[in-house]
Structures are given as C-alpha cells and as structure tokens.
Amino acid sequence: MPHYDTRNYYLEQLSPNCLDELRGKMIRSLIRSKTFNEARIAGGYWRIILDGTGLFHFKERHCENCLKAVHINEDKSKRIDYYHKVLEAKLILNDKIIVSLGTEFIENENEDVTKQDCEQNAAKRLLARIKKQYPRLKICILGDALYAAESIMQICRNNEWKYILNKNDGNQKNISKDYEYIKAAEEKYYEVNYKLEKGKSCFVNHVEEVTGKKEIF
C-alpha cells in the first residue's frame, strides 16, 4: 500500500463525480455478487438509512455556502455559529457492515439566501440521484422523524420504494393521531428479538392512508 500522503494526493486530483462513479460501480458489483442477499427484508428490499451529520463548526463565516445557527445567550445577546453538514445514504449489508450509497452536502447557495438548505431538501436531491443511479433497485428507506414528511413519503411511493420512519408526537400530530388510531383498533404489530438483536418494537403500516390527513413540511 502506498503512503497515506500519496493516497491523499492522488484523491485530491479526482473530481467528486469521478469518486461517486467509482462508488456506484463498487455497490453494483456487491449487489450482483448476491453475497449480502440475506440483508434484504421481505420482498427483496434493501434497507437504506438516511442520516445527516455535522462536519465542521466555525465562529466566523468559513465560506459563502456555510449554514448558520443563531443562539440567544443568557444576557439576550446573539451568537451566530457557522457550520457544514452532509446527508448520507447508507446501505445495510449485514448487522456489522454498512456502506455509503450516496452523499449530499447540505449547504447554502450563497450567503444572501433568505431560506437555508436543510436535511429534507438534501434528502429530496439525494433520493432523486439514487433513483437515477439504481433505477431497478428495490429500496426501503429508513429514517428518523425528520424524514416522515409527506414530500419524502411521496417520493418513495412514486419510486415504488418502501419506507420505515419514526414519528414525533410534537411536530407530527396528524401522523401520531393516525398511529394511535390503528393501535387502538389492535392492528399493531410486534417484533421481538430480531436476529442477534434483543428487544421489542411496535409498528403499524399505512399510517398516512388511515384518515386521509397528510403532514406537510
């Protein structure tokens, strides 16, 4: 193996699109090999996790693409933090192997934008690119309550994907009401001790179809 400085120098010469293309070839090779087919859930769907993470934080603006957060101190003065985030789509291959399927940076177009970029908008861009790169891949999107928005769920339905999303009682009142409605009718399902994992979970299906209400974000 070459020295890590040599590897870093080589990678710096490559465009992000080139690296993304290489990742795609590696993922398609893994899927074609059928080595990890047992990782698929019912119906042959591959689980893909959506999750955003922070990369860098600054006290001053780093570049025109910085996101910013305004904090109010105890003395009522304002403090502005600047930061960079990225959204990752991770493909689950088994209980111990998760690989990157796609990457989307969450960033402002310039410092004068009136509305900042966010994880949901980044998710829309990332999901569109995943569909283009893997048009026939059967996918089940996994995510926290942030992605349980009608716009994200509609993308999944249009792509004939499945999705498993958490709910948030505070911000998603309609979904929470539908969820409790199904539970009250005893149409809930339980999963106990899945493979090597020990525990118990409760879930219901088709929450968005029960009362006809939709969460709009």
Predicted regions and their residues:
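Short, conserved catalytic/metal-binding motifs centered on acidic residues
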Residues: 1-3, 7, 44-55, 89, ...
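Active-site-proximal, Lys/Arg-enriched surface segment
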Residues: 8-95
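An anionic, glycine-rich sequence signature occurring as long contiguous blocks
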Residues: 162-217
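Alpha-helix termini
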Residues: 1, 34-38, 131-134
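Short, structured patches in soluble enzyme cores that scaffold and shape functional sites
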Residues: 91-93, 105-107, 145, 165-169, ...
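Electropositive, glycine- and tryptophan-enriched low-complexity nucleic-acid-binding patches
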Residues: 72-137
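Domain-level cores of phosphate- or acyl-group-handling catalytic modules
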Residues: 113-174
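Short, glycine/charged-enriched secondary-structure capping and boundary segments
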Residues: 62-65, 154-158, 178-179
